[in-house]
Amino acid sequence: MDTRSYPSPPDRLSVFAESAHLPLSRPFYLDPMVTVHLCPETPVPASYTDELPLLPFSSDTLIMNNYGDPYPFPFPMPYTNYRRCDYTYGPAFIRKRNERERQRVKCVNEGYARLRRHLPEDYLEKRLSKVETLRAAIKYISYLQSLLYPDESETKKNPRTASCGSLDPALRVI
């Protein structure tokens, strides 16, 4: 059985015109059973003027004070930090921002094109994506390092057999 206690309902429920003139036990806007919908544009009824001086001007403030978030969602809202929209900025600002982004993308793409030109011709058979270009460059750099320093390439393959004497003197800890 339900062990929660509920407030007892009044003996008589009045739904007619006289209900507007009944004395209230507490202000109606503090009663959790009453849903208040305020419209700031409409004038306040004269019969409740003595009970309304504590009401805030904005219905959003009333909702925030009594119930928390005015629009509770059952899931978290993504990107809550992005409250600024494009329409808050002028068209000149947006054009400049877009131009800066185009320039940035152009520079990045030129960098990848230059990197592709330095790769061996084996990699140039097909168009490489940015990730494939970076992976090919890493492989090619390690291949070139193994040609320059054959001892270090053996050390990388077998790290346990490396001796302290094979380290670069600048990297050796004294």
Swiss-Prot record:
One GO molecular-function entry: RNA polymerase II transcription regulatory region sequence-specific DNA binding
Compartment(s): Nucleus
Gene3D superfamilies from the UniProt entry: Helix-loop-helix DNA-binding domain
Tissue: Expressed in the salivary duct cells. Also expressed at lower levels in testis and epididymis. Expressed in the olfactory epithelium (OE), in a subset of apical microvillar cells.
Region annotation Helix-loop-helix motif: where it falls in the sequence: 106-144
Keyword Transcription: yes
Example GO BP: regulation of transcription by RNA polymerase II
Primary subcellular site in the record, as a coarse category: nucleus
Sections of the chain in a coiled coil: none
UniProt name for this protein: Achaete-scute homolog 3
